[in-house]
Amino acid sequence: MAYRGSKGKAEVLEILRDQMLFLELKPGESIQDSELARKLDVSRTPVREALLALQKEGLVDIYPQSGTFVSRIDMELLSEIAYIRRMVEGDVFRTLVGQKANLRGRLEKFILLQELAARENNLKDYVVNDHLFHQALFRAAGHARAWTVIEPHFRLITRFHMLYFQSSGG
C-alpha cells in the first residue's frame, strides 16, 4: 500500500500519462485533481504538477474556472505528427542501412515481446514494446536526443491507435 505523499510528481505523471495513453482516462473526460489525489493516495500538489506537465504534452486541457479535461484527439495534429514520424524514421532507417548495423540482438527481444502480446491480444504490451523497439532504432542510429525531442509527440499516436483498436473490437 502506498503511503500519502510517497509518490512524487514523476510517478504520478507516469501513472496519469499511461491512463490517458491507454484510455483508462478517455479523451474529453473531466479530471478532478482532488479525486485523482484520493485514488493515487497522494496530496494534490504532485497531481497538479503532473497535470501541468501533461498539458505541455498535449494530453490535458486546463481551462481556469471551467475545469481540466483529457485532451480530445486532434486529427490534424495527428496527421502532421504521422508525417514527421515517416520522415524522421525514414532517415533513421537509411542511417542504419548505411552503417550496415547488426541490430538483431538489440531488437529481437522487442519483436518477440510484440509477437507474444499479439498472440495474447494484449494491445498495451504490444504498444509499449513497439515504442521500445523504435527507441532502440533511434539510439542505434545515434539519434537518442532526437528521440527524446519527438517521443512525446509520438505518444499522441498511441492514443489514436488505442482508440481505433478499442472501437473496432481488435
What are these regions (language model features)?
Residues 165-170:
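Short, intrinsically disordered, charge-balanced linker/junction segments flanking boundaries
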Residues 101-163:
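Conserved amphipathic alpha-helical segments that form helical-bundle/coiled-coil interaction surfaces
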Residues 1-98, 135, 139, 145:
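Short linear motifs at protein or domain termini
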